Amino acid sequence: MQVFGQIQIAIRQVNPAKVRKEAAKPLGAVLGGPPWDVGGILEEYPDFSLALARSLPEFRRPVIEAIIRKVSRENALFALFTALPDAIPSIFEVGWAAGEFASDTAVLTVNQIRMAFLIAAASGQEVGFNAQKRQIGAIIAAGFGWRALARELAGKIPFGEGLIPKAAIAYAGTYVAGLGLERYYAMGGAMTAAMREAAYEKAVEGGKQFAQWVLRRKHPACP
C-alpha cells in the first residue's frame, strides 16, 4: 500500500496538459513545403518535435524512438542513482524532481506514464489519464514484476556489479513498454509474447552498455 501511495503522490507531478500544449505548437516558422528533410528539421528544431510528429506522420517514428530512448535512459540513470548517488548529477539530470519520493517504483512508473503521454501526443492520439486508463493500468501492473527482479538480482551480486543489472532492467522494462505503446497507437494491437521477449533481451543488452558507459564516465575503475 505504501508503494501505491507513493505512485499516487508522484502522478501529481505529471501534467498531461503540458504535453498537449507542447504538441499544439504552431509549425509555420518550422516547415516549408514537402518533401521534408525529417532528420534535419528535427535536429534544427528539437522543441517542435512533438508538434511535428502529431501533425505529420513522416515525423512520428523518429520522434517516438527518441522519446522511448530518452525515458529509458532516464530510468536507467535513476536506478543507478538510487544505489550510487554520486554517479549521476555531474553527467545527466533526470528530468524531474525524483528525489522527493521514497519509492523508486513510484519514480520509474510515473516516468513511464509521462512517456505514455508523449507517445500518444506524437501519435496524434488523445492525451490524458481518462483517455489512457488502459495503458496506464498496464504500465503500473507490469512495472512491479521487472523492478522486483532488478532488486533481487542487484541484491545477489557484489556491490558495483549489481548496479549494472538493476539499471539494465529499468532500461529494458521502460523500452519495451514504449515499444508496446508505439505499436498500440500505430496498429491498434499489442505486441505478442515472442515480440516482447525478443525486444526485452535486446533492450537489456542496450541497458547494460548504457549503464557501463555512465559508470566509466564517473568511475573509471568500474567494469
What are the roles of these predicted feature ranges?
Residues 112, 145, 149, 173:
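Catalytic-loop motifs flanking and including active-site residues across diverse enzymes
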Residues 144-165, 213-223:
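Amphipathic, soluble alpha/beta structural segments
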Residues 101-118, 140:
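Generic alpha-helical transmembrane segments
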